[in-house]
């Protein structure tokens, strides 16, 4: 018992330690989380601290034990702990947890309580803490403290969430909610944290009371004053976060639903602008680290399960869209639609199978119709499906969205508004459409004939000015045209342009044919679309989605703003400019950043990490991949706005600049700068300008404008916009504006009023200033707000649009400059007047000689008969008016002659008095004239008066002054006579009267002379002005004439140079064409000679070996199809860029392609839009883009390859044949030896076994890829540079053929499959272009070149190539030994030729691709062991040759001795191979070395490692590596020259024949893939029939292979290839059979490829290289 007790204790101790090790981390983790919960300061902790300070009894600071005696403190702490405990326990009760996370119910209770609590704590009771009695449990203060702490803690997770508590909740929910140890540790930590909180609160109270005893009451009051604002802020924050529903005002304003294009169900229920994958959100840029703009949880739930239909089966989707489910529930309430859950599995499956079968029939019918059109003589380019849309005219260039030379991002997508005629055969005819079922085009048979009438109509329509759209041309509608058609073609009678349309009617504008009963023909899932077009259902949908809001049709831009079309790259550039100062504007597609941010807790999407950067895809595309690209059928719906070219350039420049600076770093610099600039402009810059202006006016004694400027300054408003132009607010900025960008728009921008003089006079004479001021106010009041707005820039300037040109401001000093010019001109005019007054003395000198002349004129005037008063008035009124209007300047400035003024004034007054009817008007005229005279010196600074004065000074006087007719007037009134001289007459006699008249006439003569001088000055001024004007015109004419002559000379020179260039190009092209024709003829002669020579040598040795395969052979292998695809890539589709790099003058392919490109105008195109449709069609017709048909493949079918493969496996599987050889016993012995003595080399032997497996597979597929074993291959011409090598190889082939003819069944050894194709690897450089015969050599594995074996890392042989040649005819049979003796005489010649072949063979092996051998040894230890084995092998050879035995090798190490002993034992087991054969000693040594090489160490039972399925990676490597290894220039030229020959032969023989075209090639790749997948499906089987067609195909293929194998075994004695082929052909049917022994259809990988093609996604896996074309047999 005593001895058992320690053992028992030790067991219990171990159990305890194990429990501690497992439970310890959980408990510690729980304590950690529970303790951290109490650390963050929350509102509940603040309430408890307030209870400590204000609600206690005043003795808490003495000891911690007194806290337990205070009921208020206990209630506060209890409320805190109970609330936290309830929150934790809510995890196990979901309703309580939902109440806490969605506290809408608690909102009604908590908010009023918080308001009451806030009002209650406003009062402060300073004596409350002095109470000595203990608080009872029924004390209201105790209950209030408990409720306060409880409710504030309940609000803590919602109002102020703690990250520690959130983390703890996540841990509870997802990890350790059922682990009791973790819960226990959390409880312990939580209790510890609460106790620590109480102790820390007590320490705080103690510290305050002891350190500040005098101001303790002040601290309490301060705490009381701080706490109410905190509670009130928390209350407001809670109301803003979780508002009550009845507090919010229910507005009747409904948001306008978004208009979407017409889509199918269920896509119509989705928002086309959002991501449909729930976990993928777009990211703006790489520097954007804040959360995305759209919250994905509002639109899609992470997991929503719903039943759906997929591939004819009912499935459960876990990512079913929630919006689709809600829409479906609404439809089920108002429509009688059969739901998925109500249908049976059979109905769903049959409906799906029927749709797929119909689709299959549709594509098949289209294919048959197109083939019938080809049979009727229709050209291929009109029947084959292409991606180039048909155009109306030949001269119209190809649009850039259809140009195949451009990348995809340069082409824009168009919506499905494009309607095609049945005459056009495009991709849309193959794609499935739900609104209009696809028809089989019955008229295609007739339309594909030669329709000369259609061609004649097309040619005539192109010559017309107003070209009409013909029925066989495509129709393209713009968005605005479609909407105008919808408005104009309304069925209502009383319609006007202001008619209102609902959004719902525009959304569901479907057009169906009412004559066809579509409801009966369409499937079930399409019937919903039929229901949506009916009016009652439309009304129901309007009521459901509240789509009854109306929109005005006149404002069509509002409707189109809902669409977000991509920008269009037009074919012609209308906005090109030659100004190098401006950046080149080019519209590009908006590129999106596909870097996704995953939501926390979501799963990562299963997709490959492919590189999708758009910047790396900007490359021109080759025209050879034209038919692979898909062009969408959507059209852009942008409206063509009629704006000027300058405005478009400005907008394009602004948009490009905005895109250029749309990144986060630029926003962080630009946005604060804009805000600072707006503040500086508003409060610093503009007030300073107003101050300086008015102070300057005050100093210049002008009227100030404080009120006007301040009013304009106050009108200026700043509006904050987001970076994309969305208006946000006037007072607030957008959220995170410093990250996302900001724009500031200014309404009514402030500008200083122009400087103008004030209204100093009170009579209101400054009318111009008032008019200018009124015009300025009128402009400010009448212009709209948008016209009076601008955008603020960082530098403080203003622009019309964001990032646009700087807006021009009104000039402040412009009126001032005008006034200065006016004053200067007035001063100059006064100076000219003074100069005119200097000529007054000249007038006095001529007064006396002219007195007699004036007297005679006066007497003559008295003798004239009197006239009536009216005639006097009429004759005198005109001179007076002329004086008033024409001579104002002269009369006004003649200050010396005052008498003249009085005479004129009295004269005018007498004339006015004589006519009573015009008295008033004349007085007004006189007053106006006097005013003009008096105000002449007070001219104002107005532009109108300035122009008048200038014209008066410079314009000549046209009418003379009639002063000589004054005498009749003087006789009529004597008073007027006395008044004319200014005084009464002193004498009344006749003499005094005559003197008076003489004086008067002398004054009149002086006036007339002065007038003539003035007229002369005016004429002089006019002449000067006229001369200046004529001189300027002559200069302008000379300049324009010189420019015109220079321009004409330049154009003429350019035209001549262009003509010379074209002439030189024409001459050079003709010369080059002639030389090319001559050179091509010479090359053709050489090629024909070498072709004849090759045929002669090959036919000479092959006529007794095989017979040619008949044309009606019906077996096609998949391996050969893959090979022909690989071959067609090299032959017919070279890379255009690579061809241009390897361009040489000796190249036939260059001449062949360049001539066509130059003739068609493609090579010399400077811009892509110059490529016309006709040229492109010719280019497509010329280039051989096709896959050879099965009829052509029959001529080159490798039947010998299949037969040899069958023979290979037959002998490998022949048990009787294996039993005849001692290799079985050798293997058994080797296994024993390996288990005993070779255990040290076990890893190396395992590596050797893997290498042997790989080597055997390499032999098999290398026989195929080398292509030297196909005797039926068409012979293609080769180049002269290879003649020497071909002659040498021909000799080798003769020997091989000679050996193969004398070959019998007994000579076939078990080693032959291993050596198969080994000696032909040197000829791989010429495959598959050379035609070399198939042969079976007698050589064993010993005859293989050691370099090839050494590449696999098996062993190294030290023999030379000459020693190897001596053993070429050595065999293991006596018959072969005799043949060797007979041919020994011819050995020197053969050796000489083989020696000459050594150099060329080595050169060929250098350039040939290396085989795919095994990887290096994994460790250095294996490498050292491998070296030891090689050393042992060499020592064994040396010991055998020198006669040294194993006993004398004592100087070697123990390991090497052991290796030599094992080699000796292994070689002794092979001695029975050569028994019974008499050979020389040298031959024995060679046999010994061969036997050593065949030992178990280097060839571990190769026959037992058979693999009948090739490795796809190795196969693909050997298919592609010959193309990749052609790196040197010689091989490139060689392949290019071969392409010339092949291209010439194919283009001359095969392109013109329809048989050369595969029927499947008529369809597009998408349609052909869909047809292949549909053809593989068994749509007639039931839903429960799980026996697929692939299994039947597998059984059938196995049966066929077994039958063929039996046939080979039965004809074992007849091994000739011709007999074998003839037997197979007799039993074969004329139908075509595709045997898939490499990649059959029942393989799982093949089905995976089908699924990828079915989803129309890019397949980048390895299986895409092994896909082959399936097509029906067309020739029977």
Swiss-Prot record:
Task: List, alphabetically, the Pfam families matched.
Answer: Ycf1 (PF05758)
Q: Give the record's keywords alphabetically.
A: Chloroplast, Membrane, Plastid, Plastid inner membrane, Protein transport, Transmembrane, Transmembrane helix, Transport
GO biological process terms, semicolon-separated: protein transport
Query: Can the keyword Transmembrane helix be found in this entry's annotation?
Result: yes
Transmembrane parts of this sequence: 23-43, 71-91, 96-116, 145-165, 179-199, 226-246
Principal location class: plastid
Q: Which GO terms describe its cellular component?
A: chloroplast inner membrane
State the annotated membrane topology for this chain: Multi-pass membrane protein
Q: Where in the cell is it found?
A: Plastid, Chloroplast inner membrane
Q: Which InterPro entries match?
A: TIC214
> Can you state the subunit structure given in the record?
Part of the Tic complex.
User: What family is reported?
Assistant: Belongs to the TIC214 family.
Q: What does this protein do?
A: Involved in protein precursor import into chloroplasts. May be part of an intermediate translocation complex acting as a protein-conducting channel at the inner envelope.
Q: What is this protein called?
A: Protein TIC 214
User: Which organism was this protein described from?
Assistant: Zygnema circumcarinatum
Taxonomy of origin reads: Eukaryota, Viridiplantae, Streptophyta, Zygnematophyceae, Zygnematophycidae
